[in-house]
Amino acid sequence: MSSVSEVNADIRDFLMSINLEQYLLHFREFGFYTVRDCTSINDSVLHQIGISPTGHRRRILKQLQMIFSKMQDFPIYANVHKAKNGSTTKEQQHSDPSSSTHTGIECSDSITVHRPGPAPSEMVTTSTLSEGNCQSPKSHDKLCLSSHDLLCPEEELHQNVDSSKDSLFGGVNVKIDPLITKRAVEYTAGEEHTEKGNLTSEDSSKALSTNTECLPSGDCPTSGTHSGNGTNGVLESFPPTPFFQFQGEMVVNELYVPSSPVHGPMRSRSKLVSRPSRSFLLRHRPVPEIPGSTKSIPGSYFRDRRSNTTSAGKSLTLKNSNEDNSTSIFPYGETFLFQRLESSKKRSIKNEFWPHENTVKEEAATTRNSILTQSSIYDNRKEKVSEDKVEDIWIPREDKNNLAQDSASESEYSTVEECFQSLRRKNSKASKSRTQKAFYLDPFNRHSYPLSSTSGNTEPSSTISNAISPYACFYGSSAAKEKCGWLDKLSPQGKRMFQKRWVKFDGLSISHYNNDREMYSKGIIPLTAISTVRAQGDNKFEIVTTQRTFVFRVEKEEERNDWISILLSALKSPSLASQLQAAVAPEKCGYLELRGYKAKIFTVLRGNSVWLCKNEQDFKSGLGITIIPMNVANVKQVDRAVKQSFEIITPYRSFSFTADSEREKQEWIEAVQQSIAETLSDYEVAEKIWFNESNRSCADCKAPDPDWASINLCVVICKKCAGQHRSLGPKDCKVRSLKMDASIWSNELIELFIVIGNKRANDFWAGNLQKDEELQVDSPVEKRKNFITQKYKEGKFRKTLLASLTKEELNKALCAAVVKPDVLETMALLFSGADVMCATGDPVHSTPYLLAKKAGQSLQMEFLYHNKFSDFPQYDAHFEGGSSQDAAQSSFLCDFLYQTAAAASRVSSEKKLLEDTNKKWCVLEGGFLSYYENDRCTTPNGTINISEVICLAVHKEDFYLNTGPIFVFEIYLPSERVFLFGAETSQIQRKWTETIAKRFVPFVAENLTEADYDLIGQLFYKDCHALDQWRKGWFAMDKSSLCFCLQTQEAQEERMNLRRLQELTISTMVQNGEKVDVLLLVEKGRTLYIHGHTKLDFTVWHTAIEKAAGTDGNALQDQQLCKNDVPIIVNSCIAFVTQYGLGCKYIYQKDGDPLHISELLESFKKDARSVKLRAGKHQLEDVTGVLKSFLSDIDDALLTKELYPYWVSALDTQDEKERTSKYRAFIRSLPGVNRATLAALIEHLYRVQKCSEINHMNAHNLAMVFSSCLFQTKGQTSEEVNVIEDLINNYVEIFEVKEDQVKQMDIENSFITKWKDTQVSQAGDLLIEVFVERKEPDCSIIIRISPVMEAEELTNDILAIKNIIPMKGDIWATFEVIENEELERPLHYTENVLEQVLQWSSLAEPGSAYLVVKRFLTVDSIKQCREKSIKEGILKLKEEPSKILSGNKFQDRCVVLRDGHLFIYKDPKSSKHDKMFPLRAMKFYLGVKKKMKPPTSWGLTVYSEKHHWHLCCDSLQAQMEWMASIFIAQHENDIWPPAGKERKRSITKNPKIGGLPLIPIQHERNATQARKNIETARAELERLRLSEKHDPRDFTDSSLKDRASLIAHCLEHKDEKLRNRARKHRSFNCLEDTEAEGPHGLPKAYKGPKTLKKTEERNSKATLDADPKLPSKVIEELSVVLQRSRPLHKELPDEQTLQKEVK
């Protein structure tokens, strides 16, 4: 675009070109419609019209300066003065040989102001005013000034003529013309025309003498014509000058030629506003051709002109209106006036495009001129002042009403413009509009004026307009009077007392602080809010506002008067009104909670500052607390419990705010961030880089006006893509802002972006990008991130021309390319895999960078410098066809993740660790996971070698932090370290875990990584194939399945359903001198032993397997299952009822205790494997109630609600076989677990109805009970009952049961009902010796201990045997005594006695341990201990094994018992404990071993798994108090059975017939009786074998339960003598309980000698001889079972072994 179009551009286009179109209304409101109107704009004017951000004002001023300075001509000022009534002035002509002309300036004073010394390049203004009277010239020399020909209103300068009487020339206008590039206008040197314009004055006839230093810069049309036709131009002569305009042709630098092959007649907006730096302009400035002749001006020329300023006339030389020269605006308005010869051919064009009757524009322009020129403070001095004296005066801003109607500089604005404006608008792109308002203005600027120009009187009839002289010098802001000091301020509330405050007045407001070091005030009073200031007595003064009166007090009266005078003078300042006018609406306001303040604070965001006010009324009155400037602030979201919190952080203080909602908080954060960005933004770099048209759209998504860039990839990108570019890592992508990172943008880097551009860069990066793969502007974040990673990191779309080159060839090509100017070739080589630091072969210039430096290629150097850390791999063109292993090698990920590392001891508090950490920038590349403090850091905080990972845990459930949900995964290393990472979405979590798993799981087990695993890693294992050797295998947890790939020849993936586990136990083995935990898993016929690398990863696996093997939900398939896929709860209930309920009347029609049913059902749901149903402990009715409740409460009915209409409709079929066939089809359609459960349940009900003669439960009665359970309906219907009855009656046909299975069922029923009265001993009973009160022979009792006996039962039995009745208030307990009677501890009443006894085997001297029953506590002591929730004291402590530093001595420690833990402190004043013992995990014994050499004999010993601690007390009372307190706290006050609780019995008379009873420990004399019992069992076996008609197949096929029952009966060893002896050792209460025990509905268990006699009679009827000895293997197996002390119901040996033993 030509420079004339630039100068005359519409203000809208100008603001759009610098992305500040939000200020369009501000400019138009004050009369700025074109760029030419802005010639006199400075920082103060911009501030007044409402542009508060400093960066925006600076950008506007720089752009205006650039436009005016781009003119190739020298600047010219035309100072045109217009008469009030439109009369003409006489022009004084000065002839010279060149016939050139210059204008005179009409002014009332002949005073010249000149600042000597500046260099020509500084363009210092030399102002010359000549006083004179304008004469009317001839008609052909006249050029009337028509008001409608002028663009701008008139501005008047009132000047004092002399001391006696002033002669005023109204309407003197001063206008600065923009500089216009000469090459934009074509003219002929020989055709030069000027016009004479005459100005007349009604008060004076003196003509303004010609200033020989001025040249014409504007046209003044005559009143007779608008176009200037018929007017002869006269050129004024001027002497040669070194500043004379050079008129040669300029050569355009190719750097600024657009890359587009087609160029329009004008430059685009990007070229218009691009402002290169000074060094860039110097290097690439246009080179003019040598002219034919030049003229110089002697140095004495200006001195001659200075002497001519006393001329009595004012002359004005008019130039052609079509000429494109104008004056340049420079900082502070300091310019010289120059002239150049212009052509007048196109003068008449100006009026064709300019509207002359635009009244609105004229009024607005009048406002503009009043802002630019008015001055309200003048000194009417009487004395004569020297001509060269200059006075600083304020420039007020409030007068907008005194307007002139015309401007003498009309020709400066009347150039061809409108046609160019329409073209430019088409190329303009609108930027996002932002509103930035100012609350307060900066201190006002000062200008210097000649005193004579300000001392004149203004005529009443003249329009008052105080114009700024073009000769004014800008010296910056005036030094406003400031004052600060310590004052006493009267508090507004409370006692109204004076408080010391540091008070500061900065010329705009009064603020008070707590001290002189604080940066933010406690209160602020702007001048605009002050009504008056008045003095009071006692050295006080008041500041009165509309809201309240502030009272201050000083020490001295002089100081008070000084404060008052300063404040009053500031109040009288004319600048105060301009502050009021500038107050505009805020961008955001509202009440927020501010930390440190009780009440909510009214917070206001206005422009570049945040105001804090007590309330909205204070804000409206102008009062505030403090102001937070945004240019030094930052805003961030706070991770606190209150989610609506955010902080504004400044270098001096952080302000923490809390909003009412999350939405409001986000709005505040966005508003503050936008204010900060706009305050700090500078478009200078962006405009330069946008000079290349391809850089005006994002390189990735084509978004317009991108303001970010990757400085090493050389692409310009938008804000959305910039966020994803950061994910590539700081080494591979350095993202910088074009607006805010100004320090990084050197001239060379800017030039590099202009030369390359997005188009050429994408020719390489996206050379193979298909149309359907392109990224759209509105693409989601995940797609954008994947695209950018594929494009730059993986090189998926780049050109592959260099793919065939090796690394060495690429390096050689790079060395050859860097010495040439083509940077694109270097970029292609480097990003194709060439090494930026490769060896060049030159010992001096050893790197490509040094080679480029040697060759002087600055752009190559710049590119290589920013890529010095880049490491782009050499991509294979056939990469996609490679193996998955290769794909894993190229995996790359990066993102912000929550990250923290934890030791093994702290992993339990992993979520708390994540709460205390911040996000880290995590990068996974090359098999290493590195985490950085942020995405700009180049040094990682830590690095994890993925190949060393042994376990990866993925938490599917989300965990909520203060910032929202996070999804955690853990990485375990062999060094007992665990790293926790948290992602914000499950997709990010899955992406990271999949990539990490593929890095450390080998190829042979890659199928494991494809599952939806919760845990994956490596474990050691043993199985049935090799039990003697531990091997490594890869395991993965997929919901309830354990997938594993073992080191076998097949190496196939296997799967184990953890819900079907028959056994899940943990044991310990010693390996390499250390204890290692081993997990045993048994599923059907498979056994697997596993252990981890460390205790930490084993704990993770064990916990996960236990959780997966447990119950997970209320659905049928989520229950723990047996090996036949029947839920354990169903199987256990069926087995219990089958064993004990076949002979019970109305078994399923009786209701149990609802409380017991609920407890038992909850136990099954918690862990069904651990629940063992035992007669005596569980009632039959409760078990049946559990079964019915479970079937009724599962999520879906066992027969499924979906099939309900089909089941009922089957009853319509009359044919029983056809109906049975339908039932069979329905059952096949059921889910597998439902089908197996239904089969087991119907089999059980079929068995029950088979015994209906005994239990009275036929098929119909059973169907009445179970129809509502199986269909889950309310109540019963006949159809449902009939369906269930059909299923029971037709069980054999529906489930296709074989005949031998039915026969076996009948045999089992007969055995169960036949042997129901037989008394069988409890399995695993032991006879042990228990002492009463002390260990003496007379105090011992030998008693039978069952595996389920608890300490309560043992204590009561011993007391009953000894006939001891405890005293009221005494508590007796069983004590365990060990270590040769040195240590003892009371057993809790619920502790299992046998378990404690079996643990004695691990003691050094097991034989010294025994049990004793004695008095423990009293009720009174318990009450005292319960009252003290916290117990503390000083005890002596010693640890075993002792630490090296602590020595082998007891040391005083402060011990505190609190919250179920025992805390050890070094001293009572310590705030951090040394040790902490959880009470439930410890055993506490009374006493201390003597070998520990305790200082006292009263102490406690604490046992843990690895360590022992010894505590010594001062007295026996203290010892007992500590023990009682610990015992009560350890069991949470539950230390004796509740009143009325029924005592449990462990000795049962009817144990399970199918169980395997054991021979109790007896004296040797009982062996003979045992052999007799075995012989009797053999005879019974033979009799049963004969009853099966000697069919060996039938006997072999009999069930395991049948033979187990048989052996159980054979091992009956209770003869009459032994029974009498056992009865002798039990109390009478026990005998009564024995008679009363047994399931409801069964006969009494004990029948006496008659039962034995009947049994002997049956045995005598055996037809076969019995072997007198039982096979030895049976005895061995029974011994093993006895040693293990297993519970009653255990599985028997396998079927073949049992058959062998029976035979």
From Swiss-Prot:
Compositional bias of kind Basic and acidic residues: 1653-1670, 1688-1703
Subcellular localization: Cytoplasm
Domain Arf-GAP: from-to ranges: 674-809
A GO MF label: zinc ion binding
Zinc finger (C4-type): 698-721
Rho-GAP domain sequence ranges: 1114-1295
A GO cellular component entry from the record: cytoplasm
A biological process term (GO) from this entry: signal transduction
Keyword hit for Ribosomal protein: no
InterPro entries (alphabetical): Arf-Rho-GAP_ANK-PH_domain, ARFGAP/RecO, ArfGAP_dom, ArfGAP_dom_sf, PH-like_dom_sf, PH_domain, RA_dom, Rho_GTPase_activation_prot
Residue numbers spanned by region Disordered: 84-132, 191-232, 286-319, 1633-1670, 1684-1703
Biased composition (Low complexity): 222-232
The PH domain, residue ranges: 480-572, 585-677, 899-1001, 1012-1110, 1428-1531
Keywords of the record: Cytoplasm, GTPase activation, Metal-binding, Phosphoprotein, Repeat, Zinc, Zinc-finger
SAM domain span: 6-70
Phosphotyrosine found at: Y77
Residue(s) at site: Arginine finger: Q1149
Top-level taxon in the UniProt lineage: Eukaryota
Occurrences of domain Ras-associating (ranges): 1324-1418
Phosphoserine modified-residue sites: S1627
Biased composition (Polar residues): 85-103, 123-132, 197-214, 308-319
Function: Phosphatidylinositol 3,4,5-trisphosphate-dependent GTPase-activating protein that modulates actin cytoskeleton remodeling by regulating ARF and RHO family members. Is activated by phosphatidylinositol 3,4,5-trisphosphate (PtdIns(3,4,5)P3) binding. Can be activated by phosphatidylinositol 3,4-bisphosphate (PtdIns(3,4,5)P2) binding, albeit with lower efficiency.
Name of the protein in question: Arf-GAP with Rho-GAP domain, ANK repeat and PH domain-containing protein 2
Native source species: Mus musculus
